[in-house]
């Protein structure tokens, strides 16, 4: 139940974030889109294609590190639906570089959210 709650799962949920994103972090390694949701917690969705990252090992690593960076950040306390889209550069990054980049960019998202609009 907790796992289902914390993930953007359906096509409708993904479309809502794409169509109505309020927050956007455009890094060379990935794109982070987010929109406010009606919950008291964040939900995370990830998109990493075979074209972007040909090997399943690298795709799964990207997903694992994204979930880890999400858990370590304070994003789970903010009511957002978040999608992280992998780009080709993620394929060439080390674990450490990818985790650091995700951590920094999740912090930028937190800062954007905290800024009064």
Sequence positions of predicted segments:
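Positively charged, solvent-exposed patches that mediate nucleic-acid binding
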Residues: 1-117
């Amino acid at each position: 139940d907790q796992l289902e709650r914390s993930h953007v799962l359906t096509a409708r949920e993904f479309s809502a974030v794409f169509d109505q994103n309020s927050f956007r972090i455009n890094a060379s390694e990935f794109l982070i889109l987010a929109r406010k949701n009606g919950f008291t917690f964040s939900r995370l969705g990830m998109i990493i294609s075979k074209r972007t990252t040909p090997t399943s090992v690298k795709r799964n690593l990207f997903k694992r590190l994204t979930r880890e960076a999400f858990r370590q950040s304070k994003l789970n306390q903010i009511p957002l639906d978040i999608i992280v889209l992998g780009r080709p550069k993620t394929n060439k990054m080390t674990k450490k570089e990818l985790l650091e980049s995700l951590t920094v960019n999740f912090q930028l998202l937190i800062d954007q959210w905290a800024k009064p609009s």
